[in-house]
Amino acid sequence: MDLQLEVVVLPVSDVDRAKRFYESLGWRVDADFSGPDWRVVQVTPPGSPCSIQFGTGVTSAAPGSVQGTFLVVDDIQAARAALVGRGADVIHPFPAFNRVLGESLGERAAQVAG
């Protein structure tokens, strides 16, 4: 039996700003649906089988409360250059990854502010 993580829900304070941020990083917008009291946006990073969703009425969690979500890349320097080229503020290095995860991630982790 295959078990696959499909979606992670991120609480955000400004749906349009969050959508612009992820679009600016080159993430694919899979959905942007709304009704009278709700809106859901789903975006997926290039090459990822897992997406994130955010919106209005999607979760009761506080904006910014999600912790411990990681994107892993094969080449951190190339990924950083691509993100900076798209206007992202990449905080590098992110030493907590090296202390906490050590060998498992090595030089494949960075923090992106947005």
Predicted region positions:
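Core segments of cupin and vicinal oxygen chelate
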Residues: 2-3, 9-51, 78, 85
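Short, flexible, glycine/charge-rich loop motifs used to bind or transfer phosphoryl groups or to couple energy/partner
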Residues: 42, 58-60
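Short, charge-rich, low-complexity interaction segments located
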Residues: 50-58
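Short glycine-enriched loop/turn motifs at secondary-structure junctions
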Residues: 1-4, 60-66
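Vicinal oxygen chelate
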Residues: 12-16, 62-63, 68-114
